[in-house]
């Protein structure tokens, strides 16, 4: 994961870090790298396009041009290594889930990640597009999350 952190720090904007730290007082400043959301979304998309985990059933072509091949291969390891330390790691995690094309895979990764979401911005960062095709199936999970006594699953249910 060291290479992943190096890549994230390469995207850092220190002025944005200062600004963003004031928006999230519940996150310690040293846990914020300072990466603008569009930049982090683009990076997530690049990683997703190169990872086998994000290929649809039609077996799309695996492309990993803009980031190192090794980084694309480490995506699954990153998603399975929880909790993350940095706020942007959590956002990257959510952005990667949003790129998944298989409903069951996206749902499994989201459910595994929910207990580790510790801020509103990660929770509200988006919904996997594949969920729109499975609204009835997803509704059962939404009800379960709404019934949770923890704020993050409830917040995610409301975001969906």
Regions found by a protein language model. Name each.
Residues 1-160:
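Alpha-helical scaffold domains
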């Amino acid at each position: 994961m060291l290479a992943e952190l190096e890549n994230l720090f390469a995207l850092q904007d220190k002025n944005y870090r200062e600004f963003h730290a004031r928006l999230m007082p519940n996150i310690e400043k040293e846990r914020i790298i300072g990466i603008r959301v569009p930049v982090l979304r683009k990076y997530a998309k690049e990683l997703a396009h190169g990872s086998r985990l994000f290929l649809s059933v039609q077996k799309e072509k695996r492309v990993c041009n803009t980031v190192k091949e090794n980084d694309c291969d480490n995506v699954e390891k990153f998603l399975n290594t929880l909790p993350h330390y940095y706020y942007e790691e959590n956002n990257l995690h959510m952005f990667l889930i949003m790129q998944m094309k298989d409903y069951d895979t996206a749902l499994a990764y989201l459910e595994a990640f929910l207990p580790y979401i510790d801020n509103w911005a990660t929770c509200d960062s988006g919904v996997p597009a594949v969920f729109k095709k499975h609204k009835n199936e997803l509704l059962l999970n939404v009800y379960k999350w709404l019934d949770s006594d923890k704020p993050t699953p409830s917040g995610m249910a409301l975001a969906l």
